[in-house]
Amino acid sequence: VPTIISEINGNPQIAKMGITQATGAMEGKEQRFGPAASGYWSIVTTIISTGSVNSMHDSSMPLSGMMQLLGMMINAFYGGCGVGILNYFIYIIIAVFISGLMVGRTPEFMGHKVEAREVKIAALVTLLSAFLLKGGTALAAYFVAHHANIEWAVQPANWLNNPAYHGFSEMLYEFTSANANNGSCFEGLGDNNIFWNLSTGIVLLLARFIPIIGPIAIVGLLANKKFIPESAGTLKTDSLTFGLMTFAV
């Protein structure tokens, strides 16, 4: 909803030029879709990891770009659609652990105790995502800032068509998209070169397989533990309270 409203209201910088925007922010959008449908799909596609676009995300309003990034960084909205269900499972394990600490009981999930090993794996998977997208962005920003004219096939100085703040957002979006296995990007970034193809490929591989291995390992550990019957002190994971806790995590 915030994205659709932002796109319908148009670009204030274009409005300052005296240009009428009766149809909303149309830069980078097709007339057959318009700003509302384009804004809506830009969020859906970044949440469910389709990678398809019906508008240029690089031309979206700032709020829209932020929401697109958020959708890929969380990668578990809509109940964890697609591979996001693995991330959602990790969030549940962390939420169960924190909730157990808050009430002073050993955390339990589906009749099995959640202990140190499970939480460590969940924490590593969660931190990996942040490390990959932020580490990759930091590396790219370093080359742009300090080795802009290095003798590569495509010099870092030629990567960015928007060298200011938005250029940084383009690099962040690129690695966020690779980390979320999404496929969309801010196309102001010249990313068809050996650096971006290799770096995002490595990020994609790590972000795809480690979050698969982690939850499977957790399930294996839980399956080997003795089943604990539900009691009065058992944390109910199908309650509104636990839903809010998961959302907070």
Map each language-model feature to its residues.
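Membrane-proximal intracellular helices of multi-pass ion channels
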Residues: 1-249
